[in-house]
Amino acid sequence: NQIATQQEMDLIAIRQEAVQQVYENKEGFFTFYENTSLNFIPLIRNGKKQVFILTGSQVPNVVNIGNDYLLIYNKKHKLTKKEKLHNTLLQFKGKSDDPENPITSTHHSHILSDIINSTDICTLLLYKDFVEWKQHYVISKKYVSIFDLEKEDLVVLTRKAWDKIAKFQEKKQ
């Protein structure tokens, strides 16, 4: 038997506290959806203790983005801040029902943030080997984020540049 390190014990403690916060849901802050499960991801970076909560699908061929949260803890494992990273849950098919018309890309919009966020990228990387689409776009008022799942590459354009490119493409057709 091996004894857990202090960091491992801290990770366990904040994860357990996050699970308790969610399932007590005293203020109705967290939202629950059918055929989904919550995944708790504790992190300690540069002394900051955080738990990300992602909503996973329990249905084959469905990728969930959204209904995700960030909980921040102090050194004594007390919750200091909780934040919704997306307002809603979006569900994307991993593969088309029609082999003649595969899904090549997916997209969603951001209201709360300007660019793609870490939970979007985490989810896309987790599912990249199970989906047929190669790119995911996140569109906000100021920016368009383009994440290439195959290359694991992110490009962020201003919305103005994106709109210019779209107009140019329209003229070419």
Language-model features, listed with the residues they occupy:
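Exposed beta-strand-loop-beta-strand "reactive/processing" segments of non-cytosolic proteins
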Residues: G28-L71
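Short helix-loop boundary/capping segments
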Residues: S57-P60, G66-G94
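Surface-exposed beta-strand edges and flanking loops
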Residues: P42, I53-G56, Y73, E83-K84, ...
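Active-site-proximal loop/helix of nucleotide/amide-processing enzymes and allied scaffolds
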Residues: N1-A13, E17-Q20, G28-N46, Q91-Q173
